[in-house]
Amino acid sequence: MSLNRSEKQAVIDEVTGLAAKAQTLVMAEYRGITVADMTKLRSQARDKGVNLSVLKNTLARRAVAGSAFEVVSDQMTGPLIYGFSTDAVAAAKVVADFAKTNDKLVIRGGAFAGKFLDVNGVKQLANIPSKEVLLAQVCGLLMSPMSRTAVVLGALAAKKGGGAAETPAPAEAVAA
């Protein structure tokens, strides 16, 4: 079913909005994927906050024109699914993880920070831990010296006699 001019413009406007908010774009060829597998991929993408769209390539080219994703315009050929993500690594993770289990999904490339990513670039981006994991690792590094100091002080107190002893009551309180 072909779209009329106003419907095409609506699609372009929607994808332009996605591209404006997104940090990452991943493109993958989906030739031969069953409807059930595509539904599973879309569900996984939705759970991770990734917008997956099957678009006509000419509409996709027009939508990314003038954005940071314009660098991939030359690669927009064939049956492609486009994954836009506001998280820097989410789109790459979803597509790369699904491609590991389904050989019919072939990663074609992507873009991040205005630079073209080839297949290996997308896979490397997918291997980067998520923002939450990185923050947890930084917190762990910051907490490590304090926890080590507490352990050393606890061991030192145990060695010297079991920690702070009870202080005797003042003489005035005993006399009263």
From Swiss-Prot:
Transmembrane segments: none annotated. It comes from the Bacteria. InterPro entries: Ribosomal_uL10, Ribosomal_uL10-like_sf, Ribosomal_uL10_bac, Ribosomal_uL10_bac_type, Ribosomal_uL10_CS_bac. GO terms for molecular function: large ribosomal subunit rRNA binding; structural constituent of ribosome. GO terms for biological process: translation. GO terms for cellular component: large ribosomal subunit. It holds the Pfam family Ribosomal_L10. The keyword Manganese does not apply. Keywords: Ribonucleoprotein, Ribosomal protein, RNA-binding, rRNA-binding. Part of the ribosomal stalk of the 50S ribosomal subunit. The N-terminus interacts with L11 and the large rRNA to form the base of the stalk. The C-terminus forms an elongated spine to which L12 dimers bind in a sequential fashion forming a multimeric L10(L12)X complex. Forms part of the ribosomal stalk, playing a central role in the interaction of the ribosome with GTP-bound translation factors. Belongs to the universal ribosomal protein uL10 family. NCBIfam families: PRK00099.1-1. This is Large ribosomal subunit protein uL10. It comes from Polaromonas sp. (strain JS666 / ATCC BAA-500). The gene is rplJ.
